[in-house]
């Protein structure tokens, strides 16, 4: 049986909020089987919880933001969510003492280290997957994203920025998902932004914690980070990281083929909602026999960073 997974123990880290620039403490705690992914604002009295849910995503302007019925929000959840998807964590309580998850280095890699440091524990309950049964496609102008049936989780992402530093050879990335592939190929890819956009955001009191330490920054001609890129196609890899985090907002690893062109948080979320709303397009599946599970979801004995 492929089992649900949680953490062996709680673990805590301190970082900076991307938009506030303030110190944020993040605590990750184990959770019982069938709990799912629960975000919790501990700076509120009483604490406010946000179960990971595609319909709770109500603001995708700059990041993926969960907002409850009372208008309380928790922002920048996508990189941590991607790490949870990457390692197949089904049940976890995520406590944060601020309105946003710390940005860390702008990638999912620090969260991978954190989760592996806490240790991953299998629970004696079958893990549920969402299997895509029929094609679903969402379009917005020339942007689009789609799911198709596939025995595994395949991702194909294309970006299209007219910029001297983003050549045509680094605009597409394709990956057959597995924990190992995610950790090595995707988790280290950092978020990116353009200097003119960042200056505008900061004038509006946003992105105050943004810096060359937690983002790739481009001016009109080049990449400003002294150490350059971690991968030549780091930008499109980060967009794939975002998509993996956005699609895990349903709380279940997906079995299907995801393909996107110029998609962002908003379109990723619309695609996930469209899938879930069409009862004939998907089904829950569990695997009693490890021989039946799609190759990418066979849990490795250990993940090499």
UniProtKB/Swiss-Prot annotation:
The active site is at residue 265. The keyword Glycoprotein does not apply. Disulfide bonds: none annotated. Catalyzes the hydrolysis of UDP-3-O-myristoyl-N-acetylglucosamine to form UDP-3-O-myristoylglucosamine and acetate, the committed step in lipid A biosynthesis. Pfam families: LpxC. Zn(2+) binds at residues 79, 238, 242. The keyword Lipid biosynthesis applies. Its EC number is 3.5.1.108. One of its GO terms (cellular component) is membrane. It comes from the Bacteria. One of its GO terms (molecular function) is metal ion binding. It catalyses: a UDP-3-O-[(3R)-3-hydroxyacyl]-N-acetyl-alpha-D-glucosamine + H2O = a UDP-3-O-[(3R)-3-hydroxyacyl]-alpha-D-glucosamine + acetate. Keywords: Hydrolase, Lipid A biosynthesis, Lipid biosynthesis, Lipid metabolism, Metal-binding, Zinc. Pathway: Glycolipid biosynthesis; lipid IV(A) biosynthesis; lipid IV(A) from (3R)-3-hydroxytetradecanoyl-[acyl-carrier-protein] and UDP-N-acetyl-alpha-D-glucosamine: step 2/6. SUPFAM superfamilies: Ribosomal protein S5 domain 2-like. Coiled coil: none annotated. Its cofactor is Zn(2+). GO terms for biological process: lipid A biosynthetic process. This is UDP-3-O-acyl-N-acetylglucosamine deacetylase. Belongs to the LpxC family.
């Amino acid at each position: 049986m492929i089992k649900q997974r949680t953490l062996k123990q709680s673990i805590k880290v301190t970082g900076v909020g991307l938009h506030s620039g303030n110190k944020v403490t993040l605590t990750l705690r184990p959770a019982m089987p069938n709990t799912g992914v629960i975000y919790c604002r501990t700076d509120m009295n009483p604490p406010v919880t946000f179960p990971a849910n595609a319909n709770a995503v109500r603001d995708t302007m700059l990041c993926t933001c969960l907002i409850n019925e009372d208008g309380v929000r928790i922002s920048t959840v996508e990189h941590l969510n991607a790490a949870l998807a990457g390692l197949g964590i089904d049940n976890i309580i995520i406590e944060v003492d601020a309105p946003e998850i710390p940005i860390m280095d702008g990638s999912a890699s620090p969260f991978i280290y954190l989760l592996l440091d806490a240790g991953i524990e299998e629970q004696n309950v079958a893990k549920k997957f969402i299997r895509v049964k029929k094609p679903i496609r969402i379009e917005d102008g020339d942007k689009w994203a789609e799911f198709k049936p596939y025995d595994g989780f395949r991702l194909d992402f294309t970006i299209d920025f007219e910029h001297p530093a983003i050549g045509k050879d680094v605009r597409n990335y394709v990956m057959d998902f597995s924990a190992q592939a995610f950790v090595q190929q995707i988790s280290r890819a950092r978020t990116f932004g353009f200097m003119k956009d960042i200056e505008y955001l900061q004038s509006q009191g946003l992105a105050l914690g943004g810096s060359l330490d937690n983002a790739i920054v481009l001016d009109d001609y080049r990449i400003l980070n002294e150490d350059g890129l971690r991968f030549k196609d780091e930008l499109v890899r980060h967009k794939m990281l975002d998509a993996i985090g956005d699609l895990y907002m349903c709380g279940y690893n997906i079995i299907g083929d995801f393909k996107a062109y110029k998609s962002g948080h908003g379109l990723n979320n619309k695609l996930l909602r469209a899938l879930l709303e069409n009862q004939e397009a998907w089904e829950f599946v569990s695997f009693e026999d490890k021989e039946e599970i799609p190759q990418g979801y066979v849990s490795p004995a250990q993940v090499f960073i």
